[in-house]
From Swiss-Prot:
Tissues showing expression: Red blood cells.
Pfam families the record matches: Globin
Name of the featured protein: Hemoglobin subunit alpha-2
Gene name of this polypeptide: hba2
Keywords: Heme, Iron, Metal-binding, Oxygen transport, Transport
Purpose of the protein: Involved in oxygen transport from the lung to the various peripheral tissues.
Source organism of the structure: Xenopus borealis
Record note on quaternary structure: Heterotetramer of two alpha chains and two beta chains.
Length: 142
């Protein structure tokens, strides 16, 4: 999905705020995904799935760190996430349908914590960005 200059501006404006507390926001998004879509827990057999668990927060930070890395390479998301794509496709074999579920919960979390910044333009840009990241992460499945 092609990101416009305006999309990139909005992504770069909000991602540092999210990345500053990646464990909190990433953990919240994961917790919501696990709660709403229990089948996504399959890949985390030893996790404590309670709200604010250290395991969910730590993995949430990894998710947000990866998104921040992708945001630093908006003109080459595929290149910046190639190793992560390989990991999810070949080693972890994550169901590709899980990425849009997590993307949705990231949007919900950002909207909750950043209502002033999450205007329609930022919503559109972040949605396109997360769709692009999801596409890259599932590209090796084909």
């Amino acid at each position: 999905m092609l990101l416009t200059a305006d999309d990139k501006k909005h992504i770069k404006a909000i991602l540092p705020s999210i990345a500053a507390h990646g464990d909190k926001f990433g953990g919240e998004a994961l917790y919501r995904m696990f709660l709403i879509n229990p089948k996504t827990k399959t890949y985390f057999p030893n996790f404590d799935f309670h709200h604010n668990s250290k395991q969910i927060s730590a993995h949430g930070k990894k998710v947000v760190d990866a998104l921040n890395e992708a945001a630093n390479h908006l003109d080459n998301i595929a290149g910046s996430m190639s190793k992560l794509s390989d990991l999810h496709a070949y080693d972890l074999r994550v169901d590709p349908g899980n990425f849009p579920l997590l993307a949705h919960n990231i949007l919900v979390t950002v909207a909750m914590y950043f209502p002033q910044q999450f205007d329609p333009h930022t919503h559109k840009a972040l949605d396109k960005f997360l769709a692009s990241v999801s596409s890259v992460l599932t590209s090796k499945y084909r």
